[in-house]
From Swiss-Prot:
TM helices/strands, residue ranges: 13-33
Protein topology in the membrane: Single-pass membrane protein
Keyword check for Transmembrane helix: yes
Species of provenance: Acidianus bottle-shaped virus (isolate Italy/Pozzuoli)
Stated name of the protein: Uncharacterized protein ORF37
Subcellular location: Host membrane
Keywords annotated in UniProt: Host membrane, Membrane, Transmembrane, Transmembrane helix
Length: 37
């Protein structure tokens, strides 16, 4: 890992994007599961 990569990982905006992606994927998976059930 480079210093620039570490600073990007430590930035709050990067963490926020990861959390938002996890939430979106979670909602998508739940929606797909509810459709098949």
């Amino acid at each position: 890992m480079t210093v620039e990569g570490l600073t990007i990982l430590r930035s709050p905006t990067f963490l926020t994007i990861i959390v938002l992606l996890m939430i979106v994927f979670g909602i998508a998976i739940v929606a797909l599961l509810t459709q098949y059930v």
